[in-house]
Amino acid sequence: MARVGAKSSGAGAKKKGVSFVIDCSKPVDDTILEIATLEKFLQERIKVRGKAGALGNSVSITRYNGKINVNANSNFSKRYLKYLTKKYLKKYNLRDWLRVIASNKDKNVYEVRYFRIDDEVASYEED
């Protein structure tokens, strides 16, 4: 049964490209995280049309100054990028010290930050 009043996107509709940034500058400066391995991991694992590593012209990944920029010409989920980044941290045993959070400043930016352990240390000192 067809939906009444639903408009289909015609041939004239353009796919909107999206751009996401993963900011890893603090862990990279401390040499805990290697940005080249994260870039390679994303290139190998991002799936386009069901195939991993076949980015083609639809997805491009670049790195600069501790940040990775992912540009997609087609639909691309921000959540999928977070999932892959967390998977990378788990693979290289960094998940215990680092976490991936969305930036408050910009909608399309993820930040890789350290867990805040100074609050826990203060609570242990009080006991």
UniProtKB/Swiss-Prot annotation:
InterPro entries: Ribosomal_eL22, Ribosomal_eL22_sf. Pfam families: Ribosomal_L22e. One of its GO terms (cellular component) is cytosolic large ribosomal subunit. GO terms for biological process: translation. Keywords: Ribonucleoprotein, Ribosomal protein. It comes from the Eukaryota. GO terms for molecular function: structural constituent of ribosome. This is Large ribosomal subunit protein eL22x. It comes from Arabidopsis thaliana (Mouse-ear cress). The lineage of its organism: Eukaryota, Viridiplantae, Streptophyta, Embryophyta, Tracheophyta. The gene is RPL22A.
